[in-house]
Amino acid sequence: MTKRESNTLAVLGCGMVFLVSLLDLANRLLGALGTAILSGILASMADQTADDSGRLFTNFTACVRRKETGAAVSDKISSHANANKVEILNKENLRGVKQADAVLLACQTHLYKALFDEPGMREALKKKLIISVLAGVTTAQLEAALGNGEDYFVIRAMPNIACFVRDSATVIEKPQRTFPEALLHVTDTVFKAVGNVFYIQPSAYDICTALCGSSPAFLAVFIDSMVDGAVAMGLSHKDAVDMAACTMRGAASLVLESGNPWTIRHQVASPGGSTMQGLLALEQGNVRSTISNALMVAAKEAKKLGSKENA
């Protein structure tokens, strides 16, 4: 990928994201995730100066399969100052890829082979960065579907829905073969624009898919449960949501600072106090084992997604 005055990031069909030139985006909505990544990158651009040498993208292209999807993407990003930098293409995946320097693949897991099979697609993808955010699909599977893996630069990453607010915990799989440093830098820059980045070995990828990708839903259930309890005792729903969410955010900040969640637990739960009684109620409900099991089930299911592709 060469640096130019104008570069394009492309997000292609079903959430398949391609870095088209370095600063333009061709985007297809992958449920919420593809839009979240695009939205986060657009927001990050507002923080950068016009002469910022670290900025990779200036334009974006969203490739969608339905007009209504394109309208939804347009509506979602309309509040961003750089929304006019996004071009939306309907049923023009190949055009989006040809314009791209790199690709963020964010389609539904079972659709990626069909995308690769589109006439001219494999040739258009050659020698370009392909960032896959497909749960359960390994780099080897993607390279096999493309044909000759040596002709493509595929890297796996798993961000989460917090890309929308630029606070994602994104895991990136360390490449197992020689990979151009420039392309690693692009991958790193894309996801640092929308949050924090962690590099992991392939063996830990499915675990981290659950921990980083699925757990926002688990944490939302926990917040919702606290809200229900507060509302049942008379607090307004809005106040309960705001307080619970801010409290969880503050607790997370304390854990990051201390490096140990038990530190927070012991600081808050004084002997004989109300917090300790509440903690005992959680233990009686097997909350710890239930949460741990939910994470393990999600990790196993993430692994199965890739296995089904090979069945």
Curated annotation (Swiss-Prot):
It is an enzyme of class 1 (oxidoreductase). Residues 1-31 form the signal peptide. The keyword Nucleotide-binding does not apply. Glycans are attached at residue 59. One of its GO terms (biological process) is L-proline biosynthetic process. It comes from the Eukaryota. Pfam families: F420_oxidored, P5CR_dimer. Pathway: Secondary metabolite biosynthesis. InterPro entries: 6-PGluconate_DH-like_C_sf (IPR008927), NAD(P)-bd_dom_sf (IPR036291), P5C_Rdtase_cat_N (IPR028939), P5CR-like_CS (IPR053790), P5CR_dimer (IPR029036), Pyrroline-COOH_reductase (IPR000304). Coiled coil: none annotated. Its EC number is 1.5.1.-. Induction: Expression is positively regulated by the KK-1 cluster-specific transcription factor kk1F. Disruption phenotype: Abolishes completely the production of KK-1. GO terms for molecular function: pyrroline-5-carboxylate reductase activity. Keywords: Antibiotic biosynthesis, Glycoprotein, NADP, Oxidoreductase, Signal. Transmembrane segments: none annotated. NCBIfam families: proC. Belongs to the pyrroline-5-carboxylate reductase family. HAMAP family: P5C_reductase. Delta-1-pyrroline-5-carboxylate reductase; part of the gene cluster that mediates the biosynthesis of KK-1, a novel cyclic depsipeptide with 10 residues which is a promising active compound with high activity against many plant pathogens, especially Botrytis cinerea. Within the pathway, kk1I catalyzes the synthesis of the L-pipecolic acid residue of KK-1 from delta-1-pyrroline-5-carboxylate (P5C), a metabolic intermediate of lysine. This is Delta-1-pyrroline-5-carboxylate reductase kk1I. It comes from Curvularia clavata. The lineage of its organism: Eukaryota, Fungi, Dikarya, Ascomycota, Pezizomycotina.
